[in-house]
Amino acid sequence: MARLGLCGGQGSIGESGLIAMAVVSFADPLTERLVAFVRSVGIEVRATTLPDKTFLPGLDIRNGAILVDEERLTHPGDILHEAGHLAVADPAERLAPKLSPDGGDELTSIAWSYAALRHLDLDPAIVFHDRGYKGGAAALIENFAAGNYVGVPLLQVYGMAAEPKRAAASGVEPYPHMLRWLR
């Protein structure tokens, strides 16, 4: 299949691994809202049919884009978590065929996801649902609500957010406010 279409299209993956696409919206309003936000920060999202099983149902990251199979997507909030992986990735690695985040990137993408939820004024359970985070979603929600943020030190190192002391010294809003959404 030839690669067609624009950012945000729908398509299917052919034998060559290329994606044929046409521009469409998502049927689920929450999915559409999350995708619109992710695109607004500069991350490409494509609606497609994923032929293979993926780590998160209905989602994959390829070549710097999030692929969403809405028929197989079980938790729309996972879109924000996957976007977090791309957002905090080293820009030189972001467009790799397959992204390989390390442990620090996982924590940082969790922090990025929470900041996105707060920015969108959404319930944290949308991302931190009971089927994710190895049973630790409730603890993440509780810790974030108490101001105990994981992953924020790396967001600060990347210049994406500031912890309270640095924010006060710099005259900027502290995390969960983001100074920028992409590393």
Region annotations inferred by a language model:
Residues 140-183:
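Pan-zinc metallopeptidase signature
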Residues 30, 76, 105:
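Hydrophobic (often cysteine-bearing) scaffold residues that line and stabilize catalytic clefts
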